[in-house]
Curated annotation (Swiss-Prot):
HAMAP family to which the protein is assigned, alphabetical: ADV_CAPSP
Function comment: Major capsid protein that self-associates to form penton base pentamers, each in the shape of a pentagon, situated at the 12 vertices of the pseudo T=25 capsid. Involved in virus secondary attachment to host cell after initial attachment by the fiber protein, and in endocytosis of virions. As the virus enters the host cell, penton proteins are shed concomitant with virion acidification in the endosome.
Note: All late proteins expressed from the major late promoter are produced by alternative splicing and alternative polyadenylation of the same gene giving rise to non-overlapping ORFs. A leader sequence is present in the N-terminus of all these mRNAs and is recognized by the viral shutoff protein to provide expression although conventional translation via ribosome scanning from the cap has been shut off in the host cell.
Superkingdom, taxonomy of origin: Viruses
Self-association and partners: Interacts with the fiber protein (via N-terminal tail region). Interacts with the capsid vertex protein; this interaction binds the penton base to neighboring peripentonal hexons.
Disordered: annotated span: 1-47
Record's compositionally biased regions (Low complexity): 36-47
Species assigned in the record: Fowl adenovirus C serotype 10 (strain SA2) (FAdV-10)
Induction: Expressed in the late phase of the viral replicative cycle.
MF GO annotations: structural molecule activity
Keyword set, alphabetical order: Capsid protein, Host nucleus, Host-virus interaction, Late protein, T=25 icosahedral capsid protein, Viral attachment to host cell, Viral penetration into host cytoplasm, Virion, Virus endocytosis by host, Virus entry into host cell
Major location (coarse): virion
Protein name: Penton protein
Amino acid sequence: MWGLQPPTSIPPPPPPTELTPSTYPAMVNGYPPPAASAQSCSSSGGQSELYMPLQRVMAPTGGRNSIKYRDYTPCRNTTKLFYVDNKASDIDTYNKDANHSNFRTTVIHNQDLDADTAATESIQLDNRSCWGGDLKTAVRTNCPNVSSFFQSNSVRVRMMWKRDPPTSTAPPSAVGSGYSVPGAQYKWYDLTVPEGNYALCELIDLLNEGIVQLYLSEGRQNNVQKSDIGVKFDTRNFGLLRDPVTGLVTPGTYVYKGYHPDIVLLPGCAIDFTYSRLSLLLGIGKREPYSKGFVITYEDLQGGDIPALLDLDSVDVNDADGEVIELDNAAPLLHDSAGVSYNVIYDQVTGKPVTAYRSWMLAYNVPNSQANQTTLLTVPDMAGGIGAMYTSLPDTFIAPTGFKEDNTTNLCPVVGMNLFPTYNKIYYQAASTYVQRLENSCQSATAAFNRFPENEILKQAPPMNVSSVCDNQPAVVQQGVLPVKSSLPGLQRVLITDDQRRPIPYVYKSIATVQPTVLSSATLQ
């Protein structure tokens, strides 16, 4: 009997084998199929209305990319989570004692829910998939370059605080054999500069004013003379116009032009940058930056003796131009017009008169000197030498490799990193010395920053034409994809720390977005 067979384009199921039974049950998305099973199809002659593929083929579908929130329709494939630091509802509820770098915020922005209710909600990512989140952060800062928080407003200095009374108040009349002060006693002081955002020349003025204040507060009352002030910050090159025969600076004055920050020391004095970033602002670094301690002493400046000035009254000029002098009559200038000594002594190596002051700049430029081997001349970093900025979202991301889950402030896993967004802006200002004189005359600043205008060593340091300022710029960083948790609580913690893992008080705006997406299956092998 010729009967019509039901048409079908579905291929027959694979024949069952008795030796290796199928390890995959005839299921679709975990439910029995509406059609006959493979066994019943084979027993009925292979006529099946629906071909059932193995469960592994159908497994990746069926909601494995769903993002669910409450009873709303699931969102497929991806979404975006927003982290904002100054939501009014969050401030009133969770962040009364927080700041922009350590706060909590709700990522559920449902206008029908208050902050308390939104914090109890959660966003569910299908746990059959491995999810990753693309993190993008944006931070704005208002950080000054001199602050106590970043250890850039103080430095330790060693100065004379006591000595025997001088036997005579008259200025010196002859070159000394060496620098020796009867009964001199030294001790360490903490030199602190007011916090602020300064240009380089302003910072040097404040440092020198701090040195004078230390002298006035204790040294002056204990017989310490002005010529015994043994720490000075300067910018000049004291070796310019030094006569190679006499060893004296022939004009009788040092060239009043700034080139690079410098440190001037007397015997027994020192400066300690161990716990200060001011060395970075001054452009004085370490050859071995990871070695412990950073102290510059007078002995470290071997070869940096500041040459003595030529006493113009001691020479007999015999030509019309006034450039040729009688060498036999050349003598060093022993004191300034106010009678303050220049501490002129004889160099033990050359026998020529020099001052007892030593300059770091001069010592650094002597080949193979100790200053050249242990320190490094760098561009002054007026950004404060601040390091890195770390972002942590402990309630969103799974701890990256190398971290463990922790919600402690200084132990939160790091999921984002970038340089601190302060930048050293270099500019050129022509005739900066003229501008300095104009400012001093108009603002009565001479008494504050140029207390010893007659003394060529202690006078105000000239500004540099090439100088620097600190500038804060927004930092927008694409941090990349990291694994996120499958259950995201509505209340999230955001933490932005410095390289010591402390919340940064100078962050005044921080926002972030996380875009989750499926990376792989969490159930398939």
